[in-house]
Structures are given as structure tokens and as C-alpha cells.
Amino acid sequence: MRFLLAAALAASTIASPLTAQAAPPDLSTSMPLPGRWSWTPTVDGSEATYFDTAGRAQLWLHCLRGARTVTIARPASGAAPFLMVWSSSASRNLLASFNPATAHLTAQLTAADPLLDALAFSRGRIGAGISGTAPLVAPAWPEIARVVEDCRA
């Protein structure tokens, strides 16, 4: 019985190359990019946007209420397979797509995804990263939770 339990635990910790995740940065020591969050109602839901001090949008969470999905996006210079998203309690590499017209890397989650709760209730900071670039760390403000709740209503 102990052998089966040990074998099961060992097998569960082996990650395939498709699911391997880079370790997220330590949010407790990462300084957030100076800026501010803004919440805006949209025709199809709502959106929270994080602007740097120059007024450039750096991170978006957009609710499509009819589809019950939340799209997370950040500027990117090219395509990447994953958008790494993390909070103080959870992290995940999300399959991403690149839109060359807007130069954004986007990932989509269902409104019920627990990662959205982790972002909404993160202790102080959240992050979004693209392999080969510096991670974007932003403060966790109420605008994030508002978008999540709008999508679940």
C-alpha cells in the first residue's frame, strides 16, 4: 500500500514538456510597475486596464459576459506559446495567441476559473509574463475583482 502511494505521488510530480511551468518570480520582493488600474463598463461586459505612469496600457482583463469568459492581455513584440499569470497563491501558464494588429498576447479563461479568484484576492501584487521578457508586476486592486464578478453575474 505504501509503495502504491509513493508511486502515485512520484508520478504526479512528473511534468510533461507541454505542462512544465517556469517558476514565477517572488511577488513578495518584486516591485510593481508604477501606474494605476481603471475599470470601464463595455457593451459586452467590463474591462480593467493597468496603465503605467506614461498612460500606456500594460495589462487588461476583459469580461465577455455573454460568453462568460475573461481575456487577459498584455503588450508583446511577437508570438509566444504561453502567457504566464501568477498571484500570491496561484500561477499558471495559459495558452496564448498573438494579435499582430494590436501587438497583444492574449489568453482566455472561463469566468469560473479559480485563477481569477487568485488574481482578485492576491496579497498585494499580480504578475503576467512572457518567456524571454521581464515580467509585468502590478498591484492587485479592486478593479480585477470587479471584472471577475461582472462576468459571473
Predicted regions: what they are:
Residues M1-L4:
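Positively charged n-region of N-terminal signal peptides that target proteins for export
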Residues A11-T13, D52, C63, F98, ...:
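Sterically constrained small-residue positions within well-ordered secondary structures
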Residues A20-P81:
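N-terminal secretory signal peptides
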Residues W60, F82-L83, A140, V148:
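A short, polar/proline- and glycine-enriched secondary-structure boundary/capping micro-motif
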Residues A80-R92:
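Extended low-complexity, serine/threonine- and proline-enriched intrinsically disordered segments
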